[in-house]
A protein has these predicted regions:
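Class I S-adenosyl-L-methionine
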Residues: 2-17, 21, 25-47, 62-133
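Soluble or luminal CAZymes and related metallo-dependent hydrolases
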Residues: 49-57, 133
Length: 133
C-alpha cells in the first residue's frame, strides 16, 4: 500500500498481482506427505502469510493501474466489481486433490480466455521457473 501511494493515478499500464487468497491455507495439512511437502507444511503453518488484502488494497491497485490482472480474483468477488473477462489457467493436473485451474479476474474489456499449461505445484517444476502464466 505504501508503494502504490507514491504513484499518480493510472501510472501503470498493467498490474499483474497474485495476492494471498485468505483461505487459511497456512493451517491446512498438505495431502502429499513427501519430504518437500513436509517442509512446506512446516513453513506455512508457522508463518501467517495467507491474509487476504483489504478493500483499500484493491482500490489503490485500481487507482494506479489502467489495467489489472488479479490471480485468484474469484476469492475477492466481495471486494471487486463484477468482471467480464477472466483468464482461466487449465493446469492439466488430472485426477488428484489439486485444483484443475486457477482464475484471474481482469478489467480488460474482452472475452474470457483459457490458457493451458501443465503444472502440479512444486512437483511440475523440473527446472522451469515457478511463475504464473
Amino acid at each position: 500500500m505504501e508503494l502504490m501511494a507514491r504513484y499518480e493515478d493510472n501510472y501503470f499500464d498493467l498490474a499483474i498481482v497474485d495476492p494471498p487468497y485468505g483461505i487459511g491455507a497456512g493451517s491446512k495439512k498438505f495431502i502429499n506427505r513427501n519430504t518437500a511437502n513436509k517442509k512446506a507444511e512446516a513453513f506455512y503453518r508457522d508463518n501467517d502469510w495467507d491474509i487476504a488484502p483489504s478493500k483499500e488494497y484493491f482500490n489503490e491497485l485500481k487507482r494506479v493501474s489502467k489495467n489489472y490482472i488479479i490471480w485468484g480474483g474469484n476469492y475477492f468477488t466481495n471486494l471487486l466489481e463484477p468482471a467480464r473477462c477472466y483468464i482461466v489457467w487449465d493446469k492439466k493436473t488430472g485426477d488428484n486433490s489439486y485444483a484443475d485451474c486457477e482464475l484471474a479476474l481482469t478489467n480488460i474489456d474482452g472475452n474470457a480466455r483459457v490458457f493451458t499449461k501443465f503444472w502440479l505445484g512444486s512437483h511440475a517444476n523440473n527446472g522451469t521457473p515457478r511463475i504464473h502464466p
